[in-house]
Curated annotation (Swiss-Prot):
The protein's name in its UniProt record: Maltose/maltodextrin import ATP-binding protein MalK
The organism of origin for this protein: Vibrio cholerae serotype O1 (strain ATCC 39315 / El Tor Inaba N16961)
Keywords noted in UniProt: ATP-binding, Cell inner membrane, Cell membrane, Membrane, Nucleotide-binding, Sugar transport, Translocase, Transport
Chain's gene name: malK
Domain ABC transporter: 4-234
Catalyzed reactions: D-maltose(out) + ATP + H2O = D-maltose(in) + ADP + phosphate + H(+)
């Protein structure tokens, strides 16, 4: 195990800056997920840590050693790619031991490591088979096993589940999480899927256009996003946003006016808010409530209803507004397309964002997570 530290790291291809002034500390044994949309620089950053890409400026440390100029093979990292990259003519044992054989490791040591990795990954009964005889999930476990036998200080995984179907992705993400907990290893995992990030990580790093937008525990990012980008990216379905007018401001609350004229107070830090300002109110679909239980009411025409059995998702167009809202309830709702529906907004679950995307600090304490300072 080893820690990983990035200090003001930048990566450019010619004049195009991909990773921008990244400062990050990853502790020994921590499971960290880099997440963000396509093109945000998450895989590039991972490849810089692995040594597959040169760092343009800044410093990378693994443990106490500066790694900028150290060869990839000497960094003590193991990488699992999106592609399994297995040798089709070799059986599982030979695929997993290939790197150790190249390094001329002792045969008994090779067997010991491969057998141990196969036992952990539940592949012991498949070691004599070739990759073509395996399922996608089994092939991915072999790719992980090949990295595991090298006993790296840091595991790097670049979207390893992208080639799997939905059901297998759910199974494999739990297996990878259990493996990381069992080994206690430092693991950095790249994905564009925020559900993977929320369910697997000790700490999430959200990247936006090469910048680190926010770093924190999953529930910190969910309940206390620092900006509108993180608020909209974390959570599924994504957060609802609607334009509001600021009617009143106090130190620990802000009064907003909705497009339908309704006003109510939101418990957020008001020290950065100006009366008369236009801001953006955010509320998650699962935090909307029945009309009688809200501090404010909104009405809209039902456009789409998704009845999933365990929950219902209703897509609405708000009356007197161009805004669309998603309403999510853990039950089957008696509502159909074309209906008019009135729902409630609970003030303590609201988020408030400035025009530049900065969030006002929420003052409501959510369960399972500390209030940000």
């Amino acid at each position: 195990m080893a820690s990983v530290t990035l200090k003001n790291v930048c990566k450019a291809y010619g004049d195009v800056l991909i990773s921008k002034n990244v400062d990050l500390e990853i502790q020994e044994g921590e499971f960290v997920v880099f997440v963000g949309p396509s093109g945000c620089g998450k895989s590039t950053l991972l490849r810089c840590i692995a040594g597959l890409e040169d760092i343009t400026s800044g410093d990378l440390y693994i443990g106490e050693q500066r790694m900028n100029d150290v060869e990839p093979s000497k960094r003590g990292v193991g990488m699992v790619f999106q592609s399994y990259a297995l040798y089709p003519h070799l059986n599982l044992y030979d695929n997993m031991s290939f790197g150790l054989k190249l390094s001329k490791a002792d045969k008994s040591e090779i067997k010991k490591r491969v057998d141990h990795a196969a036992e952990i990954l539940q592949l012991s009964h498949l070691l004599d088979r070739q990759p073509k005889a395996l399922s996608g999930g089994q092939r991915q476990r072999v790719a992980i096993g090949r990295t595991l036998v090298s006993q790296p200080n840091v595991f790097l995984l670049d979207e390893p589940l992208s080639n799997l179907d939905a059901a297998l992705r759910v199974q494999m993400r739990s297996e990878i999480t259990k493996l990381q907990r069992k080994l206690g290893c430092t693991m950095i995992y790249v994905t564009h899927d925020q559900v993977e990030a929320m369910t697997m990580a000790d700490k999430i790093v959200v990247l936006d256009a090469g910048f680190v937008s926010q770093v924190g525990k999953p529930l910190e990012l969910y309940h206390y996003p620092q900006n509108r980008f993180v608020a909209g990216f974390i959570g599924s379905p994504k957060m609802n946003f609607m334009s509001v007018f600021i009617e009143g401001v106090e130190k620990d609350r802000v009064q907003v006016q909705l497009s339908n004229g309704t006003t109510f107070w939101i418990p957020v830090d008001g020290t950065t808010v100006t009366r008369g300002e236009r801001m953006s109110l955010g509320i998650r679909p699962e935090h909307l409530v029945e009309a009688e239980h809200g501090d404010a009411k909104i009405e809209g025409k039902v456009m789409i209803v998704e009845k999933l059995g365990n929950e219902t998702q209703v897509y609405m167009n708000l009356k007197g507004s161009d805004s669309d809202v998603i309403y999510r309830q853990p039950d089957t709702l008696d509502v159909e397309t074309g209906d008019t529906l009135t729902i409630g907004i609970p003030a303590h679950r609201c988020h408030l964002f400035h025009s530049d995307g900065r969030a006002c600090r929420r003052l409501h304490k959510e369960k399972g997570v500390d209030l940000p300072a």
